[in-house]
Amino acid sequence: MLFRSKLVFVPEYRVFCEENACGNYDKNPACPPESGTVEEMKERALGYENTLVLQTTQDRLMDYRKAKLAHNKLTEQLAEKMKECGKTDLLIMSAGPYKHNSCMSAYCVDAQKMADAVGMQCWTNDGKFRYFSQILFRE
């Protein structure tokens, strides 16, 4: 778990969305520009006190699309469990846009600094891909 004050936002990351690297820019409502400006999205995230950082890893032999989808489904399932336990006001930052959830890139979150803050690996040379998502919530 991470306190919101530890989240690092890098507005310059929005260029990755604007270059349409994933193909969803101006097509998916969870993606920019419809999802909001950098400032609006940062303000939305900072409205929560805590964030649960989630990670899955995959080896290079797996289909990355399926692995990312599985990660996002697990994130969504956990969010539903949190709602059942009374945490009804949640914000999900997914690994890539997923349904109505914007990805961490759209929020301009620095994944490396986030991973470091919670003791997780982000970029390594072990041949594995890592997917991150977050569930932000209030106490």
Predicted regions and their residues:
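Structured loops at beta-to-helix junctions and adjacent beta-edge loops in soluble globular domains
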Residues: 34, 55-57, 138
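Short glycine-rich loop/turn motifs
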Residues: 12, 49, 129-132
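Cysteine-cluster motifs in flexible loop/terminal segments that predominantly coordinate metals
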Residues: 11-41, 97-108
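Acidic helix-start/capping segments at beta-turn-to-alpha-helix junctions
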Residues: 5-10
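Glycine-rich, aromatic-bearing surface loops/beta-hairpins
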Residues: 85-139
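Ordered, amphipathic secondary-structure segments that act as subunit-interaction surfaces
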Residues: 41-82
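N-terminal [4Fe-4S]-dependent radical SAM core
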Residues: 18, 24-27, 45, 119-122, ...
